[in-house]
Amino acid sequence: MFRMLNSSFEDDPFFSESILAHRENMRQMIRSFSEPFGRDLLSISDGRGRAHNRRGHNDGEDSLTHTDVSSFQTMDQMVSNMRNYMQKLERNFGQLSVDPNGHSFCSSSVMTYSKIGDEPPKVFQASTQTRRAPGGIKETRKAMRDSDSGLEKMAIGHHIHDRAHVIKKSKNKKTGDEEVNQEFINMNESDAHAFDEEWQSEVLKYKPGRHNLGNTRMRSVGHENPGSRELKRREKPQQSPAIEHGRRSNVLGDKLHIKGSSVKSNKK
């Protein structure tokens, strides 16, 4: 089941290395857990071959074996049905995102939890989100957390057609290492500021309520009453959230190692 759920993550370089390491840890854990019961599990999977050797046992034990085999078959059928459902869902999202003039949102996530004895639980989480808007506008968000290695990382990308600015942050809670890396696709680092402003400008066109706000302003031109003018004079200017966010980002950047890289894409 884990293979089915994270198949879409394995092809993404952001997740692939961590997923492969986590899968190997899971295999070792399952192998160590099944060793004391290995022969019993094999006998369940080979019930017909061992039936002649179990004639001395009572019917109750035979019925229990058949029940176990039936349970495994039912579980396999459930996994198969879920696999087909996930594949169909992924195809539908793929068809939806093809339309450049439509809005779409796609989200995928996977989580595993394991605990053996007195050891602390091991949790692995991975998620990805993609939002699209007309005009080739896209935002991608990816996040991953592995409690076993202590690694946490995230990436946010803003895209306009084949151009993109991606910021990646990672932190290892066990070693204390932190890093920020910027990736520039089909543009130079010097173009990043202008690109970010262009992306924000395009996104604001589709912000809910913007059209109504514009109509309200148009209707109010030349018809403003004295009460509203007095209210505007009393209003105190508030600091822009974007400015405050920028200050927090600068503080974070001072503490982390920031790297930038420009990438040229051959896609058309």
Curated annotation (Swiss-Prot):
Residues annotated with Phosphoserine modification: S8, S32, S34
Cross-referenced InterPro entries: Myeloid_leukemia_factor
Region listing for Disordered, in residue ranges: 44-66, 209-268
GO biological process per UniProt: DNA-templated transcription; myeloid progenitor cell differentiation; regulation of cell cycle G1/S phase transition; regulation of DNA-templated transcription; regulation of signal transduction by p53 class mediator
Principal localisation: cytoplasm
Annotated Basic and acidic residues bias: 56-65, 226-237
Subunit description: Interacts with CENPU. Also interacts with NRBP1/MADM, YWHAZ/14-3-3-zeta and HNRPUL2/MANP. NRBP1 recruits a serine kinase which phosphorylates both itself and MLF1. Phosphorylated MLF1 then binds to YWHAZ and is retained in the cytoplasm. Retained in the nucleus by binding to HNRPUL2. Binds to COPS3/CSN3 which is required for suppression of COP1 and activation of p53.
Family: Belongs to the MLF family.
Native organism taxonomy: Eukaryota, Metazoa, Chordata, Craniata, Vertebrata
Keyword Transport belongs to the record: no
Cellular location(s): Cytoplasm; Nucleus; Cell projection, Cilium; Cytoplasm, Cytoskeleton, Cilium basal body
Keywords: Cell cycle, Cell projection, Chromosomal rearrangement, Cytoplasm, Cytoskeleton, Developmental protein, Differentiation, DNA-binding, Nucleus, Phosphoprotein
GO molecular function: DNA binding; protein domain specific binding
Breakpoint for translocation to form NPM-MLF1 (site feature) positions: S16, E17
Protein name per Swiss-Prot or TrEMBL: Myeloid leukemia factor 1
Tissue specificity of this protein: Most abundant in testis, ovary, skeletal muscle, heart, kidney and colon. Low expression in spleen, thymus and peripheral blood leukocytes.
Annotated S-S bridges: none
